Amino acid sequence: MSKITKSPVLYIVLLVVGVWVAVNLFLTNAYQSIRTEEGLELIKSDSLVSVRIVDRDQRVDLELATPYKNHGTKVQFNYVSQRATEIVNAVNKAKIKDGFTDEVPAPSVWGSIISMLLPIAAIGLFLWFMAGPQAAGGRGIAQFSRMRSRLVSKEMPKVRFTDVAGADEAVEELQEIKDFLSDPDKYRKLGARIPKGVLLFGPPGTGKTLLARAVAGEAGVPFFSISGSDFVEMFVGVGASRVRDLFEQAKQNSPSIIFIDEIDAVGRRRGSGFGGGHDEREQTLNQLLVEMDGFDVKTNIILIAATNRSDVLDSALLRPGRFDRHVAIDAPNLQGRLKILQVHARTKPVSKSVDLEVLARKTPGFTGADLANVLNEAALLTARSNAQIIDDRALDEAVDRVMAGPQRRSRVMTDHEKLVTAYHEAGHALTAAAMRYSDPVTKVTILPRSRALGYTMVMPVQDRYSVTRNELLDKLAYAMGGRAAEELVFHDPTTGASNDIEKATSIARKMVTEFGLSKDLGAVKFGNAHNETLMGVGQMTARDYSEVTAERIDVQVRALIQNAHDEAWEVISNNRNLLDDLALNLLEKETLNQDEIAEIFKGVRKLPERHVWQSAPNREPSNKPPVKYSAMGPDSEVTAKSPKRTSNRRRLPSARRPRKDSETQE
């Protein structure tokens, strides 16, 4: 502020404003305003000394011989244009001592000069004020181009690698980055080149940002944290300027780490969407690519970025030499979930009777954020009940709230609706229990939650990363179990199976178009997925097959759904007594756990084994069993020797794809 007060520009502006105010005060007359009717009455009186009609302002100035009320001897009033003739006639008839004048005043020269100079001076002051941080104390336009990154200082609360659980591989990769920054000569002596960039990608809630914070806590070097959206501003060119400023700050504080969260906001593939080559984001991305190429080997600057959408990033950004290392951070496995629960349970009064491993088995597919939310919900429920210790009951309710939403106690169902819901959920549970490749049923309830009137929980015993054809067929049958029960018992199905039909149709279509599990169409991928964003729509699938093929796909999907419906009908028909028993227990208790369900289904009649999969008539399956595999641990090896290969051709590695989240049983 002292720089502003010392500048002569401020005093010049103040002088101009002062002169303008003084001139206006000088030119302002001392006439007091009165109402129009009062003015007309005064014109008719005998106390007028002089009258002046100002046509431009539609004003009449009166000078009186005696003061009028508290207004003195000089008064004025205004009139509308429609009464101009009336005013003139009244003045002509009036008895005025010095007569009257009618004038159109010329504009004031000083007023014109002041009115012209004042806006010019105001604009000049604004431009000077916004010219740069040196002239305006760092609040100018140039400040927009500066990077508002957060520099993590030593005094800030730190996260260590010990606080990160369930991502051991990612921690190992980032530990190497931290070691390089602290002892770069160790790697240079061996001719190793440390990666310039590390990309952390994975679904939301898996701990990407937490890992970056752990690097900041462990590295002991300046850590610049910024979001990808901070590069985009209202001014064109600001993004590229901020990229330059960010890397300049990092070079001045070398060795250092730059962390860009949600980099897909600025690193999206060029040419997608609107804007073309002149899009502001593309300019920012180009500058980011240039800066990453300009890294010196001895600069000791490492860029870490996190994103949920690595599939939309520009290929030039992902190539070696920029983001050399891509670290996938997926949902944790059983041991990872257990470690995460143990980390979050440190600061909460969890009962000693709680087995966190059991809780970890109940939450397959949960991310670190989901598990943290489970314990937080359990703590809130415990506090709501005025208890002091978090027990199994609170944790079970917390899991249900995270998975299916809170209970809808205000949703009151009729007795018939409860009966239909009980049979619907019993149909799901019974079909899942009678399938040979389905996961065990762990919970059934008819308590409304969120949009569902009830739900059946089917949880895998262990983590799996691929799904077999029989498992998918069991999922289809289990999904149609509720609809089959309604048809069999009430002969009048309801709309409650709409979500089940949607899920079953999605699985069946993927089996035909993505997984190659249709004998008629074979192992062919139908449909080409595009990740370009257009009008707010994310991934789109373009149809690259004919109308005839589309009809065949629909026929195969319908056949899979029909077969699943038939299997569910057969299971429920063969076990009608168990269906009635489970529905009755649900109506009495509303919620059944795994032990209670297993007791009811003790005598369930399983569905016969399906025919062996044969993709073509000429491809007879082998009767020779696979080699034996020892399941002693993750480091165990195949115990039986595999047959020797007679060919010297190099065998390519397998490219089995992990199971998507949408393929998990719900």
From Swiss-Prot:
It is an enzyme of class 3 (hydrolase). Binds 1 zinc ion per subunit. GO terms for molecular function: ATP binding; ATP hydrolysis activity; ATP-dependent peptidase activity; metalloendopeptidase activity; zinc ion binding. Residues 29-108 are extracellular. The chain crosses the membrane at residues 8-28, 109-129. SMART domains: AAA. It is found in: Cell membrane. It is a multi-pass membrane protein. Residues 642-659 have a biased composition (Basic residues). Residues 1-7, 130-666 are cytoplasmic. GO terms for cellular component: plasma membrane. Homohexamer. In the central section; belongs to the AAA ATPase family. In the C-terminal section; belongs to the peptidase M41 family. Acts as a processive, ATP-dependent zinc metallopeptidase for both cytoplasmic and membrane proteins. Plays a role in the quality control of integral membrane proteins. This is ATP-dependent zinc metalloprotease FtsH. It comes from Tropheryma whipplei (strain Twist).
